[in-house]
């Protein structure tokens, strides 16, 4: 008798639609599905893929990072496109004139961008203004900035490891003796 083939790892795991039931997000997906199919632009395909992503894969972009990225050469008068949130940064005082398109912008940011003579667009307005993504700069927030990434990597306690251990407390008796000082076993 032959052995039946395992089919449990056959499928390619990727999102074909957003997990969220948000009707406004799903309307955007409908729109960008159409644009991705009918235009030959990779911009629309990337935006569609990012609309499907989970929240951890759509990290927020701070105002300071947005300004820094838009100050680069050749990016003046272009629209910054963020498939995610833009959050305010109170450390920044003067905001240059920006043209921004994002899923959500905090109220503080919104008022500051408009005050500096900038413009804020939604994705359906962007689809009318730039159906192929012309004169746009696609930006995204730092994915690895989440605290959880500090715990990943080489095991804590091994030589040259900078990985944060999962400990109950940060006291004197926790992760401070064996392997940390020569008098207690060894020192890495």
Curated annotation (Swiss-Prot):
GO biological process terms on file: cytoplasmic translation
Keyword Cytoplasm part of the UniProt annotation: yes
Region (Disordered): 153-188
Keyword Ligase: no
Keywords on record: Cytoplasm, Endoplasmic reticulum, Ribonucleoprotein, Ribosomal protein
Compositionally biased spans, kind Basic residues: 178-188
GO molecular function terms attached to this record: RNA binding; structural constituent of ribosome
A single cellular component GO annotation: cytosolic large ribosomal subunit
Subcellular location: Cytoplasm, Cytosol; Cytoplasm; Rough endoplasmic reticulum
Origin superkingdom: Eukaryota
Similarity comment: family membership: Belongs to the eukaryotic ribosomal protein eL18 family.
Assembly mode: Component of the large ribosomal subunit.
Cited function: Component of the large ribosomal subunit. The ribosome is a large ribonucleoprotein complex responsible for the synthesis of proteins in the cell.
Protein name per the record: Large ribosomal subunit protein eL18B
Species assigned in the record: Xenopus laevis (African clawed frog)
Source taxonomy: Eukaryota, Metazoa, Chordata, Craniata, Vertebrata
């Amino acid at each position: 008798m032959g052995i039946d083939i395992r089919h449990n790892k056959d499928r390619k795991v990727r999102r074909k639609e957003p997990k969220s039931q948000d009707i406004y997000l799903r309307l955007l997906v409908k729109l960008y599905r159409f644009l991705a199919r009918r235009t030959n632009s990779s911009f629309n395909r990337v935006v569609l893929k990012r609309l499907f992503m989970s929240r951890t894969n759509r990290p927020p972009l701070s105002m300071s990072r947005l300004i820094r990225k838009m100050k680069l050469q050749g990016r003046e008068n272009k629209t910054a496109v963020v498939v995610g949130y833009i959050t305010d940064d109170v450390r920044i005082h003067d905001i240059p004139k920006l043209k921004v398109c994002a899923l959500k912008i905090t109220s503080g940011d919104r008022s500051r961008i408009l005050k500096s003579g900038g413009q804020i667009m939604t994705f359906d307005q962007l689809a009318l203004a730039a159906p192929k993504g012309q004169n746009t700069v696609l930006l995204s927030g730092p994915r690895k900035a989440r605290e959880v990434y500090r715990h990943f990597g080489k095991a804590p306690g091994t030589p040259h490891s900078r990985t944060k251990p999962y400990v109950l407390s940060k006291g004197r008796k926790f992760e401070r003796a064996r392997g940390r000082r020569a008098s207690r076993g060894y020192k890495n």
